[in-house]
Regions:
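Alpha-helix N-cap/helix-initiation motif
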Residues: 272-276
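Solvent-exposed, polar/charged alpha-helical surfaces in well-ordered, non-transmembrane soluble domains
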Residues: 277-284, 288
Length: 356
């Protein structure tokens, strides 16, 4: 096999959760280390830019998919496998074997190992030049409605690659033919720019809280096959922020303490200036509720940094919670979030605020 230095010659290297190599021709390599094999990762896909009149509740910032994945070495290949924690059992329980056998995880992609000098080097160009399994860039219903063809690679590209300590970000543009495109589109073409965040889930999973029907939680559904109920036992975990007292002794004395990690919402740079003070006030008004739970300054509103202040900041980055301001005739607002499928811990949230 070729030497690593020869394969990645003249490519831009970026170290982080998954080291990457990328060049101007659009070739992209991942370097998968032994330490990341088998580790739970969350892949979150979002629109960065979408065509006009595509779908009433789809906009820049909308999530197209959220999937738990891990990398597995199989011979001379690295497989990307989708994982699920929906059906569970104690590993020491005999029924655990049946749970595994009846919940076989799908293989999303398989990559040849081209070099193993400093980890397993795999080319992922084709994977990110397609609407690959799990991306769900265009739902099947809309593909049928707009009579869309496959991805035209000549009019598609990988636009941005960035890797950070706990996440790796890939942005690409995918272009499709569409013989029955949305109104106002005479080109019979639809192009989408999509960002994929691959983020490391917490190594110390948050303690779970079970859903209480008396409280309006968003929740995760699971089925426990090790239950004493003598049947498959369905239950739900509350999706919640991980607020932990920075001073536990003071917290136990009933004093207000700041959390170790406050909830931070960034305002979309597209938010009209005249509304921004009220957006910030509306967000931070929730602090009075958190004070009842013993926390002060638990939730903070900030303006998103400018490119000059932080060139790496991206609204689509799954590390950051955003209030997205959307130029749309749609009314009202929505509040989707991304959570750890193991525990329900909210990783980030994007409030979609429509102009109407």
């Amino acid at each position: 096999p070729k030497a690593l230095s020869e394969i990645v010659k003249d490519m831009t290297a970026d170290q982080g959760l998954i080291p990457t190599f990328f060049n101007e021709k659009g070739t992209l390599y991942f370097q998968i280390s032994d330490s990341i094999l088998g580790r739970d990762l969350l892949m979150v896909s979002r629109y960065v830019q979408i065509p006009a009149n595509f779908n009433a509740y789809s906009n820049a910032g909308s999530k197209t998919s959220e999937q738990l994945v891990h990398f597995v070495k199989k011979g001379n290949k690295i497989q990307l496998i989708q994982k699920s924690y929906s059906n569970v059992a104690e590993q020491t329980d005999p029924i655990y074997l049946s749970v595994v056998q009846n919940n076989f995880d799908p293989i999303l992609a398989s990559f040849e190992i081209e070099n193993s000098e400093q980890g397993y080097l795999i080319e992922v160009t084709d994977y990110f030049m397609n609407d690959s399994p799990g991306f769900n860039v265009v739902p099947s219903r809309l593909k049928t409605q707009y009579k869309m063809g496959g991805v035209d690679k000549k009019r598609s590209a990988i636009d941005r690659v960035a890797s950070f300590p706990i996440n790796t970000e890939i942005t690409h543009t995918l272009t499709y033919s569409a013989s029955k495109a949305p109104r106002g589109n005479n080109a019979e073409t639809l192009s989408f720019q999509v960002n994929h965040s691959i983020i490391e889930l917490p190594r110390d999973p948050m303690p779970v809280r079970y859903e209480d029907k008396r409280v309006g939680w968003f929740s995760l559904g699971k089925i426990n096959y090790s239950s004493q109920a003598l049947k498959s036992d369905a239950y739900r975990l509350a999706r919640r922020w991980r607020l932990e007292p920075s001073d536990m002794e003071a917290y136990k004395r009933g004093e207000l303490v700041p959390p170790v990690k406050p909830i931070v919402y960034y305002l979309d740079p597209a938010t009209p200036l005249k509304w921004r003070p009220y957006f910030r006030k509306g967000i931070e008004d929730w602090n009075s509720a958190f004070e009842k739970a013993g926390f002060k300054n638990a939730i903070i509103a900030k303006d998103a940094p400018t490119p000059e202040e932080d060139p790496d900041f991206s609204p689509e980055d799954a590390r950051f919670s955003m209030v997205r301001y959307v130029a749309s005739t749609t009314r009202n607002a929505t509040g989707p979030s991304v959570s750890d499928p193991r525990t329900g811990e909210i990783i980030e949230s994007d409030i979609i605020w429509y102009h109407n």
